[in-house]
């Protein structure tokens, strides 16, 4: 008997065609509990359906997911309607879900909600109990798997943000029967390390079963009673565990937890430089303002100082002196002009000027001016005054006209 050799692609295609031709598999109705739920940004929903003995991968494309009457969650019991086919690229078969109805709530989900309600009534979730996250931690304790992707993400974020931060790793189990015990032990030990400022409790994504260790009641009390603040970064953004509600801060991922715990050195330096610049400008403005006030007061003081008052009075005296001199000089000039005018007038009436024209004056011996001939009759001698001298004469006779 000759056996035909097939390529991988041919084999996967043959299996796919076989499954697609099966009536039952093309109209399958499968009951199970949702696990490992992922809602993609495209709108497609990826998850697994499981029961006590097995599980099958499922996908529900956006066009069908849009018609769902409820929001699927991990732990829900559902009945999924669709067809079973092969994803040729991976060689895996899965259920392509076209519709889904809620059947009931899974056992794990029931246990989760029951514990959540119990701890809520005990006020373990209240914000009043949340410890403040230190802004500038120097040493960060990390409780996680030493081989998991979560630790690598935390280390990478720490190196990127601040290489000076020390990480103290406590290697713990993050899933399985003993996981909760090792996580509790890690919290106790790191609380005894005096210089640990904050603790990160982390693991990567997984199904509700894989994350179940973080829904442990004793672990919840350990987180609540921790003296040091705890940040949880468990699973993906859509995953919520009990410790997320109890912790002092819940981060959607391990990387996000590291972003919160480790301050960015460059950002801090820039903030300090900005503060320095702002303080410098603030102080310069204050100094400038005070200097202006000082100059203003200085001007006022100088304006009212005795020295300035005396100087100003001296200036006033000088001005008055100059004004007085001007007035005196004006008065003198005026009097000079008057004197000159009177002198000219007097000169014009000076008898000597008449003598210059050939006339003479006659005086008696007492130098009294004689203007009539009758006065001569009583005199024997007279004085004759010329323009350039005088003569004494005797009267011999008087002739009348």
UniProtKB/Swiss-Prot annotation:
GO terms for biological process: DNA catabolic process. Keywords: Cytoplasm, Exonuclease, Hydrolase, Nuclease. Its EC number is 3.1.11.6. Its main location: cytoplasm. It catalyses: Exonucleolytic cleavage in either 5'- to 3'- or 3'- to 5'-direction to yield nucleoside 5'-phosphates. It holds the Pfam family tRNA_anti_2. CDD domains: ExoVII_LU_OBF (cd04489). It is found in: Cytoplasm. GO terms for cellular component: cytoplasm; exodeoxyribonuclease VII complex. Belongs to the XseA family. PANTHER family: EXODEOXYRIBONUCLEASE 7 LARGE SUBUNIT. Bidirectionally degrades single-stranded DNA into large acid-insoluble oligonucleotides, which are then degraded further into small acid-soluble oligonucleotides. Heterooligomer composed of large and small subunits. This is Exodeoxyribonuclease 7 large subunit. It comes from Clostridium botulinum (strain Langeland / NCTC 10281 / Type F).
């Amino acid at each position: 008997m000759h056996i035909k050799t097939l390529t991988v692609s041919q084999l996967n295609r043959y299996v796919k065609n076989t499954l697609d031709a099966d009536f039952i598999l093309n109209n399958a109705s499968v009951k199970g509990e949702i696990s490992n739920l992922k809602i993609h940004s495209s709108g497609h929903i990826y998850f697994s359906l499981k029961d006590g003995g097995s599980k099958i991968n499922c996908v529900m494309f956006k066009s069908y997911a849009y018609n769902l009457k409820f929001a699927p969650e991990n732990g829900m019991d559902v009945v999924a309607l669709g067809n079973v086919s092969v994803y040729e690229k991976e060689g895996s078969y899965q259920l392509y879900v076209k519709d889904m109805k809620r059947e009931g709530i899974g056992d794990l989900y029931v246990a989760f909600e029951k514990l959540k309600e119990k701890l809520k009534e005990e006020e373990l979730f209240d914000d009043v109990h949340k410890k403040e996250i230190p802004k500038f931690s120097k040493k960060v304790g990390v409780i996680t798997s030493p081989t998991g992707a979560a630790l690598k993400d935390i280390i990478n974020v720490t190196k990127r943000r601040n290489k000076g931060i020390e990480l103290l790793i406590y290697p713990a189990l993050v899933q399985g029967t003993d996981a909760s015990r090792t996580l509790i032990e890690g919290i106790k030990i790191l609380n005894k390390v005096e210089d640990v400022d904050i603790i990160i409790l982390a693991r990567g994504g997984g199904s509700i079963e894989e994350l179940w260790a973080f829904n442990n009641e004793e672990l919840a009390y350990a987180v609540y009673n921790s003296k040091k603040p705890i940040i949880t970064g468990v699973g993906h953004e859509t995953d919520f565990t009990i410790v997320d509600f109890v912790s002092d801060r819940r981060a959607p991922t391990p990387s996000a937890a590291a972003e919160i715990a480790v301050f960015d050195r460059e950002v801090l330096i820039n903030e300090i430089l900005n503060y320095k610049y702002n303080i410098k400008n603030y102080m310069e403005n204050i100094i400038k303002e005070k200097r202006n006030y000082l100059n203003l007061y200085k001007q006022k003081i100088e304006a009212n100082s005795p020295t300035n008052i005396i100087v100003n009075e001296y200036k006033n005296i000088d001005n008055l002196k100059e004004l007085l001199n001007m007035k005196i000089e004006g008065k003198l000039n005026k009097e000079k002009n008057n004197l000159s005018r009177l002198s000219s007038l007097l000169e014009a009436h000076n008898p000597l000027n008449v003598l210059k024209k050939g006339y003479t004056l006659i005086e008696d011996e007492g130098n009294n001016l004689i203007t009539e001939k009758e006065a001569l009759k009583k005199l024997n001698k007279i004085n004759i005054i010329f323009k350039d001298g005088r003569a004494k004469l005797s009267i011999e006779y008087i002739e009348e006209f």
